[in-house]
Curated annotation (Swiss-Prot):
It comes from Avian nephritis virus 1. GO terms for molecular function: ATP binding; RNA binding; RNA-directed RNA polymerase activity; serine-type peptidase activity. One of its GO terms (biological process) is viral RNA genome replication. Residues 940-981 are annotated as: Disordered. Residues 1257-1390 form the RdRp catalytic domain. The chain crosses the membrane at residues 190-210, 295-315, 323-343, 360-380, 399-419. Residues 941-961 have a biased composition (Low complexity). Keywords: ATP-binding, Covalent protein-RNA linkage, Host membrane, Hydrolase, Membrane, Nucleotide-binding, Nucleotidyltransferase, Phosphoprotein, Protease, RNA-directed RNA polymerase, Serine protease, Transferase, Transmembrane, Transmembrane helix, Viral RNA replication. InterPro entries: Astro_VPg (IPR045836), DNA/RNA_pol_sf (IPR043502), Peptidase_S1_PA (IPR009003), Peptidase_S1_PA_chymotrypsin (IPR043504), Rev_trsase/Diguanyl_cyclase (IPR043128), RNA-dir_pol_C (IPR001205), RNA-dir_pol_PSvirus (IPR007094). This is Non-structural polyprotein 1AB. The record marks 204-205, 478-479, 717-718, 730-731, 809-810, 954-955 as: Cleavage.
Length: 1512
């Protein structure tokens, strides 16, 4: 035993304590650390010592004698002849107690590992349940939203129904009011009543009707009664032989006077006629003949023109009133000698007044001017006095138009008098004109549709006709497109193929596909095998080979396999309807047979043989080849060099269709749609019932999660149990039962086994759990047997306590060495008080709080302060955990108040544990002392949130040993090294250690203003106080004569640059071979030359001079950037910009960057500027840009100048433009502006293909000279006003005046040059303002629209519509750079017209050599990339001389070797498709830098072999 330590004066100070790695595996109770240290010194570098350290448990007999156990085998390390000897031993010289202790420790470690595995499995299950809860919650929310939408629709329909009912009633009322006696229905009723009244009157008053005697004989006479019925008051015929007047009078005299009877009989006879005359009267022969003669005479007089024209007029008339007027006017027109064909058209489409005026003129009484004037006056009076649906202005306009048409018609009449149209020509012309009129009226008609929600949509039928014609033309020219070389897009069939593998004859692999109820592949893939292994979407199964299908005149066969039951959902291919030369696509797997890839190209089909230019590889045999419709065309069997050889199977399966019992993708989609629609139509009650079921299931899942969390916590708490019935308490010898026999006993019940299977445990994991449980049960059983008759229980308990404490320390150290990620995934039990807070919502907040021993109460108090009782809203989660030596508290779903947590991010507090044994009369007492020390800066940073109490406050007076330890130098903490490989996050760029660090991406807005800096801003640093530095000196140094000198400010800045940058790191590279470029140097002439761009030309007032083109360009810009509408002005403190840039004048006098200024003074000046009313003018600071330029420009001092303002003004502009700029950056693939675009990962190819589609085959490249400086102020301010228009009304109302002031400062600048001159510039877009590129894009967009509208006007005489312009013109623009494609039929582009237009209208400079026309994108350039298409994809070729010049004459020094390596890799990426010599040169330099880095021990990232190709 070691002594208690020195206590008296002159005692030797204790030696610094250093914990040895591997101490956890030792079980010797005394002097472990010193023995291990001496053992390492003696054997640390030998192989025997390394193998000993690989054992599970190590026992130190002495420095030269060690035992170890691994599994069930013991090993011994001794010294033989001065050398360590490590060997296995079957019977080690150990006591049973020592063996039991080593076995117990080994078992405890095994149980600890299994517990960790079980804990991880449970936590994974918890995460899955949480995901399921989240999915159900989302589904519940979607269902509720759907119900709300249905309710809104039902309410809208109800309201619409009510509106329609009210409208119907109103229409009925109006209809009743309009029904008058002059209506057609009333007129018919009136005629009916008149007819009835006439009949009744005639019946009452009688008539002059009488009989007519027919000159025919009759054998009998009629009596008086018969005569009276036939002849009195009736028109009838009576045979002359049957009439006897005297006998009739005598018979009548019986009733009345004889003379009266004779008179009545005489009056009843009207006359006498022959039999032929009777027939003519009965059949109305005379009337019919007269009618026929009249018609014939009319036809002969008027020909057939009049009736035909009248007939068509009546057909085309709009109502009955118009029909009557038209018929009358036609008759008058015929009488007046007017031509009936034009008169018919006038009657049909012109007002009736126009036709009447033409008839009046035809009478010959009024001249043309007079009738025209009267016609116009009449129509105007009608427009004013007679109400109509149209506006009065529209009606007056119509009156004027038809008044102009009237003399034109009359003149046409007069001209037609000199010609004669035959009857047949009139008929044909009339029919054609009427038919065309009907068709035109139908096409131009407007259709109104009322939606169920009440919205009304209108469209014209002519648009549908255009769409139909476009569809027909698309189908008609589809084959032509293929011939022209345009590769079509193919449907994705990535899920339709499977991987087939066989083990016969060394094994082979290929691709299979489903056709009907079988899977097919190439015959040589399966060979003679009977069983094949099929893999689809990670699912693997066995399938029988049913046979081979012989292919006619082909060397290979087509193998047919059955479909395994798990693969019933494998999509089915559909056969192509025809096979002909066209573009095809082959679907297969990559070289590793992991990911699906495709090959596309032109296929030549010769009979059943198919050849395509696919450079395939082993493993692609059996791949399906599809046509442009996604239908199965053929099968790939192999390749010859770069030509794929396949077989067309359309005719093979034509007689025996393969698709019999399966459903196609379209049928399945239709069925799914029908099911979805059926589910939508269920009633509200059913939806409510479903919601209740989902809520119950959600609650049940939440309960399961809570139970699992509790189980997890209980499992972790069990690690602290200190009982002899555990692994840590086992130290006794075994009894008479066989361990092998016990391990065969049953541990899990059937219910427990099934529950583990349902929870996702595999058979191997269940077996490990069972083995661990059995091991635990076996040890417990041994403990129970040894407890009987055991008297020395106190010493055993003390020994158990010591072993348990040692194991706890080892477990705690191992858990702490797992890294930061472990605390975020598990709630770990600690011996000291520890808090962990995580809240995920709009932003992620994580905090860890650690307390030394003795401060558990304070930990609980802080926990109660941070965790509130408020529940988090939906979509946010939080977890809080408190770990104490005797309990664990966990809370989830509550809002956490982080203001009680004070973070110290620059300090690391480590814990070192020291155990001292003090010898006292009352016995041995184990004391623990924990000190909190500050770790070195190179150690990883751990967040510490509550200041740690001083250790002196927790020490007790009766512990002098601990106080002495406190005064010694702090021991260096032993930490487990992180052995994982370094990785770089692709999202945020942060480097972390794999498998050790739990990486959380940082926010991409890394340039947010820092907090702090509350020192008041002195007046001499404010942006609007620059005038105090200006002296009234008229000293002209570089400013041209036509610009004023406002004063002079004395500043100490570089004016001329004559030396180039010297970078020592570049000395280790070979000098590149490049010429024509260099880094910039300049003299004072460069400042003078920078003013030339403002004086190239003056713009005209294009708004007044070209109003139509201006309106067209405005409409085009609005259509393109309409996504900016509804943006907001953000607070200035939320803006983001580069804070390491110059703070401009006057802040640059005291600070090198904006960051320094903000750290000192904060953002109060920024906020005051945004909230106040501004009327002053900021000062703009100018300096020349150091970059790589052409040697000619450098020699001519043609250097670009940067103009920037105070960062307060810059951030003010950012508050106005940030949201709009972000929206533009998000739409580079679908819109013109390319701010934030990338050419990599196919980005350049997608954009070039987009702009050259839809017939836009002509490519135009245009580059302005001095674009920023020559932009007209009127145009620039117009774009700024357009951006203001896109803001919300609230933002415009609140910040409108401030925005107007800011916009004015952009083009009216007080400018300070490095020479100290202060001048006034009133033109151009300053290159240092926040939105320079975005504003240039808008100007570019506007000018392009104006340019093509101008060209179209020159070619066709009209300005195109915005729709036609956008359909025929598409382009990419980045600032002043533009690549455009247009349809050649749209404009016949003339470069000289464009040059003259920009110079004469806008005062802008376009050089003739900067306008280039191409028939294809090849050779054109955009953003420094010259477009080429080497492998079917558009890539960019750069100017390697300019890029490599940065390695020869750099513009700035590189900070370290890693930066040089990164620059070389970046240059190789850019030059990959350019000069091969440049790529080879860069590869050699990269290799040289990597060799140097390895020699210096510098770790560089690894770049794969295909990195440079795949990134494009």
């Amino acid at each position: 035993m070691a002594s208690a330590g020195p206590t008296g004066a002159g005692a030797r100070p204790p030696k610094a304590f250093t914990a040895q790695a591997g101490l956890a595996k030792l079980v010797n109770p005394a002097g472990l650390n010193s023995i291990l240290a001496r053992g390492k010194e003696k054997f640390g570098g030998t192989q025997a010592w390394k193998e000993l350290m690989g054992c599970d448990v190590i026992f130190a007999r002495s420095i030269s004698h060690w035992y170890g156990i691994k599994g069930t085998t013991y090993y011994e390390l001794t010294v033989a002849l001065g050398q360590p000897l490590y060997k296995p031993v079957t019977d080690p010289e150990l006591t049973e107690e020592e063996k039991a202790v080593m076995t117990a420790v080994q078992s405890r470690f095994a149980q600890s590992n299994s517990s960790v595995v079980l804990t991880r499995t449970l936590l994974n299950k918890t995460c899955e349940l949480k995901d399921r809860i989240r999915e159900l919650t989302d589904e519940l929310g979607q269902t509720e939203v759907h119900l709300a939408r249905e309710k809104v629709k039902a309410a809208a329909l109800k309201l619409e129904n009510r509106k329609l009912f009210v409208e119907n009633q109103e229409l009925k009322d109006q209809l009743e009011k309009e029904r008058t006696k002059h209506g057609w229905k009333g007129l018919k009723t009136l005629c009916l009543w008149i007819f009835l009244a006439t009949l009744i009157g005639g019946y009452i008053t009688g008539s002059n009707a009488a009989c007519t005697l027919v000159d025919v004989p009759s054998p009998m006479k009629v009596g008086y009664d018969t005569f009276k019925q036939m002849c009195i008051h009736k028109d009838s015929y009576l045979p002359d032989g049957a009439f006897d007047k005297e006998s009739l009078a005598l018979e009548c005299s019986k009733q009345m006077d004889y003379m009266d009877c004779k008179e009545v009989i005489t009056d009843s006879i009207s006359g006498k006629t022959s039999f032929a005359g009777m027939l003519r009267d009965v059949f109305r022969v005379d009337e019919i003949v007269t009618a026929i003669r009249t018609v014939v005479r009319f036809a002969m007089d008027f020909s057939l023109a009049y009736p035909i024209c009248v007939m068509f007029v009546l057909i085309l008339t709009r109502n009955k009133k118009h029909a009557i007027i038209s018929a009358c006017c036609a008759l008058v027109a015929k009488c007046c000698g007017l031509r009936l064909l034009p008169f018919t058209l006038v009657l049909t489409y012109a007002p009736s007044e126009t036709a009447i005026a033409g008839c009046i003129y035809g009478l010959g009484y009024i001249s043309i001017p007079l009738v025209t004037f009267l016609h116009w006056v009449g129509l105007v009076l009608k427009a004013i006095l007679v109400p109509d649906d149209c506006y009065i202005g529209t009606r007056v306009s119509h009156a004027l138009a038809w008044s102009i048409m009237l003399p034109m018609w009359i003149i046409t009449q007069e001209l037609m008098a000199f010609t004669e149209f035959p009857l047949e020509l009139q008929i044909v012309t009339t029919v054609v004109v009427c038919t065309a009129g009907f068709g035109f009226r139908y096409l131009t008609g407007t259709v109104t549709i009322t939606e169920p929600d009440g919205t009304v949509k209108k469209y014209k039928r002519i648009f549908n006709a255009k769409s139909a014609i476009g569809t027909i033309s698309t189908v008609f020219f589809e084959k032509a497109k293929a011939i022209r070389g345009v590769i079509p897009s193919f449907p994705s069939k990535a899920d339709n193929i499977v991987k087939i593998e066989v083990d016969v004859d060394g094994g082979s692999a290929g691709v299979g596909f489903r056709l009907g109820n079988y899977i097919y592949t190439a015959g040589h893939v399966v060979g003679e095998a009977k069983i094949a292994k099929i893999t689809w979407k990670g699912l693997t199964s066995q399938a029988k080979v049913l046979g081979h299908i012989e292919l006619p005149l082909f060397t290979d066969t087509l193998a047919r396999l059955e479909i395994p039951k798990p693969f019933q959902q494998l999509p089915v291919f559909r056969l192509a309807k025809s096979s002909e030369n066209d573009y095809v696509q082959m679907v297969c797997f990559d070289n590793q047979l992991q990911n699906v890839v495709t090959f596309s190209g032109w296929a030549n089909i010769d009979g059943d043989y198919l050849n395509a230019p696919f450079e395939t590889y082993a493993g692609t045999s059996g791949s399906p080849i599809i046509n442009r419709d996604g239908r199965m065309l053929g099968v790939h069997f192999g390749s010859n060099a770069v030509v794929s050889q396949g077989f067309v199977i359309t005719r093979l399966f034509a007689t025996e269709p393969a698709v019999k019992q399966c459903k196609s993708d379209e049928d399945l989609a239709d069925e799914i749609v029908r099911k979805v629609m059926g589910g939508i139509r269920i009633s509200f009650a059913s939806l409510t019932s479903e919601l209740e079921k989902q809520r119950d299931e959600l609650n049940a899942l939440k309960q399961m999660v809570n139970d699992l969390i509790d189980t997890d916590l209980v499992a972790l708490e069990k690690k602290k149990g200190k009982t002899k019935r555990t692994v840590r308490g086992q130290k006794h010898k075994t009894k008479a039962i066989s361990k092998a026999a016990f391990m065969k006993t049953k541990v899990l019940t059937e219910e427990e086994y099934r529950r583990l299977e349902e929870e996702g445990f595999t058979k191997d994991e269940i077996k490990d759990i069972v083995d661990n449980l059995r091991e635990q049960a076996w040890l417990d059983y041994q403990n129970q047997l040894d407890e009987e008759g055991d008297d020395d229980w106190y010493e055993q308990m003390e020994e158990d306590q010591r072993i348990n404490d040692q194991i706890d320390q080892n477990i705690e150290r191992d858990l702490e060495d797992r890294g930061e990620w472990y605390g975020q995934r598990k709630i770990t039990f600690k011996q000291r008080a520890m808090l962990r807070f995580i809240q995920l919502g709009r932003q992620q907040q994580v905090a860890t709080v650690s307390f030394p021993d003795g401060y558990e109460d304070r930990a609980e108090e802080l926990y109660n302060k941070v965790v509130t009782t408020e529940d988090l809203p939906e979509g946010e989660t939080s977890e809080a955990a408190l770990s104490l030596p005797n309990k664990i508290v966990h809370q989830a779903g509550k809002r956490l108040n982080f203001k009680h947590v004070k973070i110290h991010p620059d300090k690391t507090f480590m814990k070192s544990g020291v155990t001292q044994i003090e010898e006292k009369p009352e016995g041995d007492i184990i004391l623990k002392a924990k000190t909190t020390t500050l770790a070195p800066k190179e150690e990883p940073v751990i967040q510490q949130v509550e200041q740690q109490p001083q250790v002196e406050q927790q020490q007790q007076p009766q512990q002098p040993v601990v106080e002495e330890k406190k005064r010694t130098p702090p021991p260096k903490p032993q930490r487990k090294p992180k052995t994982g490989a370094k990785a770089k996050c692709l999202d945020c760029g942060e480097t972390f250690v794999e498998r050790q660090d739990f990486h959380v991406c940082k926010s991409k807005k890394l340039n947010e203003p820092p907090s702090g800096g509350y020192t008041p801003v002195p007046d001499h640093l404010r942006w609007n106080n620059w005038q105090i530095y200006m002296e009234p000196l008229d000293l002209r140094i570089t400013v041209p004569e036509n610009y004023p000198i406002l004063g002079h400010i004395a500043i100490d800045k570089l004016v001329e640059r004559k030396k180039k940058v010297n970078d020592p790191l570049l000395k280790m590279l070979e000098q590149p071979k490049c010429e024509g470029f260099t880094s910039t140097t300049w003299t004072r002439k460069a400042y003078t030359k920078s003013f030339e761009k403002f004086d190239y030309g003056d713009a005209v007032d294009f708004v007044q001079d070209y109003p139509e083109l201006t309106a067209f360009a405005d409409a085009a810009v609005l259509a393109e950037v309409g996504y900016m509408e509804g943006t907001h002005v953000i607070p200035i403190q939320e803006t983001s910009k580069n804070m390491d840039s110059t703070p401009a004048f006057p802040k640059m006098l005291d600070f090198d960057s904006e960051r320094d200024y903000l750290e000192a003074h904060g953002m109060k000046e920024y906020i005051d500027t945004q909230l106040g009313v501004q009327s002053g003018k900021p000062l703009w600071w100018c300096f020349l840009k150091n970059e790589i330029l052409k040697e000619k420009k450098v020699s001519e001092d043609d250097i670009r100048i940067i103009t920037c303002s105070d960062p307060v003004i810059t951030r003010l502009g950012a508050s106005f433009d940030s949201e709009q700029n972000e929206r533009m950056k998000e739409r580079t693939e679908t819109h013109h502006a390319q701010v934030g675009w990338t050419p990599f990962f196919g980005g350049l190819d997608k954009r070039v293909r987009r702009i050259t589609s839809c017939g836009r085959t002509q490519v135009l490249e245009l580059d302005w000279t001095r674009f920023d400086g020559t932009i007209p102020v009127q145009l620039f301010q117009r774009m700024r006003e357009l951006r203001k228009f896109f803001l919300t009304r609230r933002s415009r109302r609140r910040y409108g005046k401030l925005l107007d002031w800011y916009n004015a400062q952009l083009t009216d600048r007080i400018t300070l040059l490095p020479t100290g001159e202060v001048t006034h510039v009133k033109k151009g877009n300053p290159s240092g303002q926040f939105s320079t590129t975005v504003d240039n894009n808008l100007v570019n967009e506007w000018l392009t629209a104006f340019e093509f509208g101008y060209q179209h006007l020159e070619n066709h005489g009209i300005i195109p519509t915005v729709r036609d312009y956008r359909a025929n013109v598409d382009f990419l623009c980045y600032g002043d750079d533009r690549l455009l494609a247009f349809n050649p039929s749209f404009v016949n582009y003339d470069p000289q017209v464009t040059i003259d237009m920009y110079k004469n209208i806008f005062g802008m400079w376009v050089k003739p050599e900067n306008i280039k026309l191409f028939d294809s994108p090849t050779g054109s350039s955009f953003c420094g990339f010259t477009l080429v298409k080497p492998h079917g994809q558009w890539v960019g070729v750069v100017n390697v001389n300019k890029l490599l010049q940065s390695l020869k004459t750099p513009t700035r020094r590189l900070p370290d070797l890693e930066s040089l390596w990164g620059k070389l890799v970046s240059l190789k990426i850019m030059c990959y498709h350019s000069d091969p010599e440049a790529v080879s040169y860069l590869s050699n330099q990269i290799r040289r830098v990597e060799e140097y880095a390895r020699a210096e021990g510098i770790e560089l990232p690894e770049v794969g072999p295909d990195f440079y190709r795949k990134i494009w």
